[in-house]
Amino acid sequence: MSRKQRISAGLGLGASLLCCNPLFAGPVGPDRNFGMEVKVTAQSEDDRDLDTRSGGDAEGIALDLRPWVYGQRGNWGAMVMLQAVAATDIIETDPTDPNEEPGGDPANGFSRDSSRDPDKSYLALREFELGTIGRQRIRSLTNEGTWWDIHMESVNWTMDTSLLRAQAGVAKRFDEYRTDLDNLSAEDKDRTHVFGGLDYQWRQGHWAGFKVHHTSDDGDLPDSQMDVYEDRQSKSYTGDLTWLSVHLDRDFFNPRSTLPINYWGEFTWLTGEMDRSHFASDGSADHYKDVDVDAWAVDLGLRWNISDRWNVGAAYARGQAGEGDDESEQFMQTGLQSNRSTFTGLQTRIHRFGEASRGELTNLQVGTLFTSWKPREDLETSLIYHKFWRVDDDEDLGQNGISPIEKDGKPALKAGEKDLGQEVDLIITRYFNQGMLPANWGGELDEQSALIRLRSGLFFPSNAYASKGDSKMHRVFVDMIWRF
C-alpha cells in the first residue's frame, strides 16, 4: 500500500472512530461539540520573482473543508480535525502552514525537491490531540507569533491565571499527514524542539517575562553542492541552538484591551554550535565547519488607542547579521514561527513583516507604522506601512516571500546595498454572528465566527534587488469562512 493510500485509509479510519467513540457520542452539548469550517480563498499574486524567471504568480480559488469533533469528560478532552482542499492553483488557505508559504532561493534558479511540492488538492489529518499530547497548535502565551505559532506533534502544557502565565513543551515533526507530501522538509527531519516561558503581571496590565527554546538536530548535511542546487530545502545546518528572551508587555497583542497605551518590547539572544558543509572547488563536501553562534534580535511596539474605534501605532524589529570563518552573528528564528499577530490592536492576525514580502528576522531591519479603525463590532480595518533594510549589505536574507534570481549578470541581491524596499498592507474584515464556535473550544482556530476578509499587500522593491525586472509585486487574498 502506498503512503498516500495509507494516509487516506487513516483519514477514513479516524472519521469512523470519531463516530463510534463514546467520548464523542450523543447530542451536541456543552461538553460534546462537532462541526465543520468551510473556507473559500481567492488569491492573486504577481510576481514573487520580480520578473527574473518564469512563474512566481498565483491566480485561483480554493475550497477548504475542515470537519472537527471536540469532546470533554472530566479533566480529559480530545479533538480531531480533518481537512480536504480542492483548488485551481497552489492556493494558500492556511497562512500558518509552512508548506503553503511562497519562497525561493535567490542564489539560483533550481526548484526544490519535487516530493515536497504541494498539490492543488489534497486530504489531510490536520490536528489530533488528547489532553496535552498530539498534533496541535503550538502558540506562545504572549501571542506575538515570532516564536511559536504552528501545528506540530508535541506535548504542550500551559497555565494561565490572572497574575501568572506559564508554558512548557517538547515538539518534533514525524509526518505531514497530507496525501500530497511524501517527505518531511529537510529542516524538520531529526530536529527536536524543547520550549517554555513564564510571564508575571507585576502591575495591573503590565507583564514581564521570558521565553526559552532549544533545538537539537542530529541529521545529515548534503554531500555535495549539487545536492543543495537540486533541493533548495536541503538541511542547511545541524547542531544545537538555544534562544533566550526577556520581554515587557502591556496588552500589545490583546485585541480586547481597553488601556489607552499598549506596548511591547523583547530582546532575544541566540547562542549555540552548529555544523555546516564546506564545499571544495569540485563541489564535494570536503569537510564540515563547526560554527559558534552568538546573535541577537529586538522587537518593539507601541500603540495609542485614541478611542474604542481608532488607534495608531509604530513597531520596529531587527535581527543581527554577520558571518566569520568559525563564528556567526546571524540571527535566525526558531522555525516554529508564523510571524502573524494582532499587533494592530484588532482581532485579525496580520503578518508582522508584510503580507506581500513576508520577511523572516534574519539580516533584516523593519520599521512599521499602522492605524486601525473599527466603526462597529462586526467590521475592522488596518492600514500598515513597512520599510525594509538589510542589516549587513553583504549577507543573504532569511526565507521570505520575495525570491528573485540572478539575471543578465546582475545578482539577486547587490553587495553594498541595504535598502530592500517598502510595502503597504490593507486588511479589512467583516464578521458575522452566525457560525460562532462553542464557548469552551476554539483555541485551535484564529477566528471565533464566520467572516469575509481582504488581505492585501503591495511591495515596492528597492536598490538591493539588483536583478529585478518589476517595480512592484502584490499578494491579495479574499477569505470567506463559514461554520456549521
Curated annotation (Swiss-Prot):
InterPro entries: Alginate_export_dom, Alginate_Permeability_Chnl. Transmembrane segments: none annotated. One of its GO terms (biological process) is alginic acid biosynthetic process. Keywords: Alginate biosynthesis, Cell outer membrane, Membrane, Signal. Pfam families: Alginate_exp. It is found in: Cell outer membrane. Residues 93-118 are annotated as: Disordered. One of its GO terms (cellular component) is cell outer membrane. It is a peripheral membrane protein. Residues 93-103 have a biased composition (Acidic residues). Has non-porin-like, channel-forming properties and probably functions as an alginate permeability pore. Belongs to the AlgE family. This is Alginate production protein AlgE.
